[in-house]
Amino acid sequence: MKWMEKYIDKRTNPSLILENVKSVISLALLYDTPVIHREDENLPKISRYAWGERDYHKIIKSKLKQICNEIELLSPNIKTKFYVDDGPVMDKVWAVRSGLGWMGKNTNVINPEYGSYFFLSEIFNFFLSEIFINIEFEYDEPIEDYCKNCRLCLIEPDRSVI
């Protein structure tokens, strides 16, 4: 993915994405489905996130726009910017730091309840008003890495629970 090299500065410094950024809201939208595709070895396997009829970017962006509109209604000085794995953002890093899951050895973010069947997105926001700048947010802590010495997702990815 050559394009990821382009904006290394923005990936490591969120204030280059949105000036005066104060918070990053990391979100996960589940895509796990009870529908099971046929286990025919002659057919290609398609990842679950691609089973839908619509582009997940459009679905999630619509939801994020609604959330950002609500946040921005709180004050005319609040600004937001969001991405759905399509911007200069380290989605997995923000997800882990926000407590959505831990980084598995297979490089997927894994949540103890939902596995890795979710899309990641981020909302960056800042408050121009001094009243809001001084508000301290309660942040979720990163969660424990449950992988420990397990390597099943690397050895037999089809059998691991992710």
Language-model region placement:
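Auxiliary alpha/beta "docking" domains used to position bulky ligands
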Residues: 1-146
